[in-house]
Design a protein with these regions (language model features):
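Glycine/proline-enriched, intrinsically flexible loops and inter-domain linkers
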Residues: 1-191
Length: 191
């Protein structure tokens, strides 16, 4: 089960005057406070304690901040099985529905951002679903559930194709059957 989280961030000096903010960038104070609030709010909704918070202040983060988050989990050895996948195994997608948000996130975090990029890159930030994630955490605490799972993977920034593709050497996935947040998305957009 997931039992705690950690957060490591890098920002420039948040006490610097707003007048010294780089053109096209938000003030460091706003970034630092907003990120801390967002992380805290999300963790509270999921029900996780954040055991480690480390904020690094350095001038090299003035143009692009660093934000790293992780959750830690544990399970009794007897509740975890590791088996190879077999033909006919069922793949279950568990969690929130898939949307355009988050698509391209793996590469988007490394892009050069400008005043105009907010129009095209905002969708690369995945919009989570804390209540659903909390239910999944509670489900995985049940040993009778965890013993049914041969392999498990999170979607991460790679999306459906990467997450499922890492489970077996060869498989077919009908991307049009993936539960979606809204109508109009086709398989090629979420792959």
């Amino acid at each position: 089960y997931v039992y705690q989280a950690m957060r490591v961030t890098g920002a420039a000096d948040p006490t610097v005057s707003v007048k010294e903010t780089l053109k096209g960038k938000l003030p460091q104070k706003k970034l630092v406070r907003g990120a801390a609030h967002g992380y805290s709010s999300y963790g509270n909704q999921i029900g996780l304690a954040t055991g480690l918070v480390k904020e690094i202040y350095h001038p090299d983060y003035v143009a692009k901040r660093m934000e790293i988050g992780a959750v830690l989990g544990a399970a009794p050895r007897r509740a975890v099985i590791r088996e190879n996948s077999d033909p006919g195994d069922i793949i279950v997608l568990l969690g929130g529905r898939t949307g355009r948000d988050g698509c391209g996130g793996a590469t988007g975090s490394s892009k050069v951002h400008t005043e105009e990029s907010i129009e095209t890159c905002g969708a690369e930030v995945q919009k989570g679903n804390p209540p659903t994630e909390r239910k999944i955490q509670r489900l995985f605490r049940r040993e009778e559930v965890s013993k049914l799972i041969k392999k498990c993977n999170d979607f991460g920034a790679g999306g459906v194709s990467v997450a499922i593709g890492e489970l077996a050497d060869g498989l077919r996935v009908d991307l049009d059957k993936v539960p979606k947040k809204y109508a109009g998305l086709d398989g090629t957009e979420i792959a």
